[in-house]
């Protein structure tokens, strides 16, 4: 029992359409999850929120969004690997940011100004909400 020659193009079209549909909504799902996590984190009263981090937003003007996300991920990793607070949320946020980030970047702590974890998370939340509105 074979497929008729008329059915094959229809099946190929359906396959292509569903892959575009699924791929297009990945952006929405990832961003929504990041924003949800950031909302949870920024409303928490926790001493870790005052920990110093490199100000990843004080990068040169030619820094891409992907590089900024990569640098933010590095700082999040540094916090949740060396402190026991908020590990579940920061680890999940790092994983999601990594899917939006460039593969390599650097944070030169000697040249970078410092901020707090709360400021980093608030800045990320603003960027992600803006990005979500354009998605």
Curated annotation (Swiss-Prot):
Any GO CC annotation of this UniProt entry: extracellular space
Pfam families given in the database record: IL4
Signal peptide: 1-24
Paired cysteines (S-S): 27-135, 48-85, 70-105
Keyword Chloroplast: no
Location relative to the cell: Secreted
Gene Ontology MF terms in the entry: cytokine activity; growth factor activity; interleukin-4 receptor binding
Keywords of this entry: B-cell activation, Cytokine, Disulfide bond, Glycoprotein, Growth factor, Secreted, Signal
The protein's role, per its UniProt record: Participates in at least several B-cell activation processes as well as of other cell types. It is a costimulator of DNA-synthesis. It induces the expression of class II MHC molecules on resting B-cells. It enhances both secretion and cell surface expression of IgE and IgG1. It also regulates the expression of the low affinity Fc receptor for IgE (CD23) on both lymphocytes and monocytes. Positively regulates IL31RA expression in macrophages. Stimulates autophagy in dendritic cells by interfering with mTORC1 signaling and through the induction of RUFY4.
The name this protein goes by in its record: Interleukin-4
Organismal lineage: Eukaryota, Metazoa, Chordata, Craniata, Vertebrata
């Amino acid at each position: 029992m074979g497929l008729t020659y008329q059915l094959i193009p229809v099946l190929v079209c359906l396959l292509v359409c569903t892959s575009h549909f699924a791929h297009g909504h990945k952006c929405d799902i990832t961003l929504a999850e990041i924003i949800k996590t950031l909302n949870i984190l920024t409303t928490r009263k926790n001493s870790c929120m005052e920990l110093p981090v490199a100000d990843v937003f004080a990068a040169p003007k030619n820094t891409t969004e992907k590089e900024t996300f990569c640098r933010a991920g590095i700082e999040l990793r540094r916090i949740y690997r060396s402190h026991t607070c908020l590990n579940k949320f920061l680890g999940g946020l790092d994983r999601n940011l990594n899917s939006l980030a460039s593969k390599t970047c650097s944070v030169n702590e000697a040249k970078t100004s410092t901020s707090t974890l709360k400021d980093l998370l608030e800045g990320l939340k603003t960027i992600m909400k803006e990005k979500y509105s354009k998605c």
